[in-house]
Amino acid sequence: MTNSNFNHGNHGSNLPARLFTKQSQALIYNYKEAAVQRMLDFDNVSQRDTPSVGGLIHPGSDGGMYKAFFGFKELVIPVYNSVSEACQQCPNADVFLNFASHRSAYQSSLLALREPSIQTVVIIAEGVPENEARSLISIAKKLGKVIIGPATVGGIQAGCFKIGNTAGTIVYIMACKLYRSGSVGFVSKSGGLSNEMYNVLSRCTDGIYEGIAIGGDAFPGSTLTDHALRYEKLPEVQMIVILGELGGWDEYGIVEALKKGEITKPICAWVSGTVAKIFPTEVQFGHAGAKSGGETESADAKNKALREAGAVVPTSFEDFSNVIAATYAKLQSKGLVKPVEEPTPPELPLDFKTAVKAGKVRKPTSIISTICDDRGDELSYAGVPISEVCKEQYNMGDVIGLLWFKRKLPPYASKFFEMCLKLVADHGPCVSGAHNTIVAARAGKDLVSSLVSGLLTIGPRFGGAIDDSARVFQDAVDNNLQPSQFVEGMKSKGKRIPGIGHLIKSADEIDKRVVLLKDYAFTHFSSTKYLEYALEVEKYTLQKANNLILNVDGCIGVLFLDLLHSSGLFTQHEIKEIIDVGYLNGFFIVGRSVGLIGHALDQRRNKQGLYRHQADDVHYAL
C-alpha cells in the first residue's frame, strides 16, 4: 500500500548506516546523574577503552567538573555552560543527548544540529510541539544529521554505545547480553517495549546488534523505515525486528521498501494496538502518535500489509518470540550467522550505597546524630515530626527543648527559655559584641561576617558567664558553703565570681532583666534553691562594692540549675552533663544573635561609612 501522507522523516534513506562506534562520545545536555553513570557502567562491561560521556552541559552554570565512576576508577567529566563551548572543547563528541524539557528542547537541539561535530541528536522530552519537531526534522535533513526522538528512551549498539537510560540497569544489560554484539537490528516506537524486546531477542537469537526507540510522538526525527534501511546496509545485521504501533503511516514505508527490494534481509514485525478495533471512536493509546483513527492506520491493516509484503508477522504479540526464533533458526541452518564467542565482561563494582542496601558491606559512620532525623518522608526533631511541630504551634522554647535537651518540656520551662532569649537579645550598641558587629558592617562585610565578628567577643567577660556561674554556684550549694565562705574562697584563689558584677548596673540602678527573671522563677518554679543562694551571695558582695550585683548571666545560670533540678525531667547525670558540655551559654549566643543581626542591618540600612576610632580617645603611651 502506498500513501502520499506517509512521513519518511530523514528519508530516502539518507541516514548513515553506522551511527555509533566504540569511539563515539556524547555531550549530555541538562544531564541526569543516573543516566551518566549507567552509560559509563555499560562502557565498562562492554570493555570500551574510552568513556562514552565526553562532557556535560548545564546551561547557565559556572562550569566545573562532575565526578562519576568508569569501572573501578573515578572519572572527572567537564561541565560546560553552553552547547557551543562544549562542542569546541570536545570536538570528538558526535552525539548530543538532550534531557531538556519539552519547553526548551527545540532551541537546545537546534544549537546542537548547527554544530559541525554533532552528527546525532537524541531528544528525550515528550510533548515537543509538532511544529517545532517538524522544523528540527527539516533542518536535520538539510544538514545531513540524524535525530532520534522526541519522546524516546534512546537506543543502544550492543557492546559499543548506549544512550542514556536505554535498557535500564546494568543487571538487565548483563541478563540481555547487551555487552556484546549480536546479529539483530531492532527498531521500535516504544521505549518500554524495546527494553522487553531486548530480553526476548537475547533468548530467541544471538542478541541485538543495535536497537533504536524512535519515540512515540506524531513526528519522530527518524522513522522505523529509516532505521530498517540502515540495518539493510550493515553487514553485521542478519535480520531485522520491527515493533510498530497503530496510528500514522510509518510502517507502510517498510512495506514499500520490501516491495521495491530495498530491504532483502528477513524482517519479523508486529504492530501493536489490534485491540483498538473494539472502540467505536478514535482513542489515544499512550503515545501522541498512537491513535485509533482510519482503517489504514489500524494495527490490523498494517500487520496485513507487512505480511503481504514479505515480512514475518505473527498472529498475536504472544507469538512474536516464536516467529523470531524460527526466522533466526533458518539463518543458522543456512550458515548466515555464526555462534557468538561469549566474552567475559569485567566485573562491575557495586556502588557503595547499593552495596550497603544489599547488606554486602559495612562501614563505620562518621557522625552520630541523636537530635534529628532527615531520612524518610519527613524531618523530625527528637522523634517529633516537623508537621506536628508546626500544627501544635511549638514555640522556639519547645524547639530548643527538642534539639538541645531531646525532650518536650513543660510550658513553663519552654516559656522560660523564650524569656531568656528575649532578655539577652540586645543591650545597646556600646557593648563589645554589638560594637564589633557595627565596625565590621561599616567596613562593608557581609551579614554572616558581621554577626560572627560580634559573636567572637562572647566569653567570660561578656555574655559567656552563664555556664561558669551555674558551675560555681552548684558547687558551692552542693558543698554547703556559706555565702561568705564561697566569696572569700573565690577571692583567695584570685578569681572573679562568674555572674556577679556589672559595669553600669548597681544596687541603686537595678537591672530590670534580672528582676523579670526572678519574678518569673518565684511564680512558676517549684524550687528556687540556687537562686536564693545566689541572692544571699549578692547581699555579701554588695557590702564590698555597689556594682557587685547578681547580673543577668548569673541569674540565668542559677535559674537553670533550679529548673533542671526541680522539673523532675533530668537525672543527676544528665544535669552534670548539661552543665559540663556548656548548654547554657547557647542561650546567650542564640538570643544575642538577634540583636547583632539587627545592628548589622541597621548600619547597612543607614549607609554608614567605615568606622575609625577618634584619636583623642586613645592614650598613646610611647
Curated annotation (Swiss-Prot):
Mg(2+) binds at residue 245. Its EC number is 2.3.3.8. The active site is at 287 (tele-phosphohistidine intermediate). It is an enzyme of class 2 (transferase). The lineage of its organism: Eukaryota, Amoebozoa, Evosea, Eumycetozoa, Dictyostelia. GO terms for molecular function: ATP binding; ATP citrate synthase activity; metal ion binding. One of its GO terms (cellular component) is phagocytic vesicle. ATP binds at residues 228-248, 279-305. Keywords: ATP-binding, Cytoplasm, Lipid biosynthesis, Lipid metabolism, Magnesium, Metal-binding, Nucleotide-binding, Phosphoprotein, Transferase. CoA binds at residues 306-316. It is found in: Cytoplasm. Homotetramer. InterPro entries: Cit_synth/succinyl-CoA_lig_AS (IPR017440), Citrate_synth-like_lrg_a-sub (IPR016142), Citrate_synth-like_sm_a-sub (IPR016143), Citrate_synthase (IPR002020), Citrate_synthase_sf (IPR036969), Citrt_syn/SCS-alpha_CS (IPR033847), NAD(P)-bd_dom_sf (IPR036291), Succ-CoA_synthase_bsu_CS (IPR017866). In the N-terminal section; belongs to the succinate/malate CoA ligase beta subunit family. In the C-terminal section; belongs to the succinate/malate CoA ligase alpha subunit family. This is Probable ATP-citrate synthase. It catalyses: oxaloacetate + acetyl-CoA + ADP + phosphate = citrate + ATP + CoA. The gene is acly. The keyword Lipid metabolism applies. One of its GO terms (biological process) is acetyl-CoA biosynthetic process. It comes from the Eukaryota. Catalyzes the cleavage of citrate into oxaloacetate and acetyl-CoA, the latter serving as common substrate in multiple biochemical reactions in protein, carbohydrate and lipid metabolism.
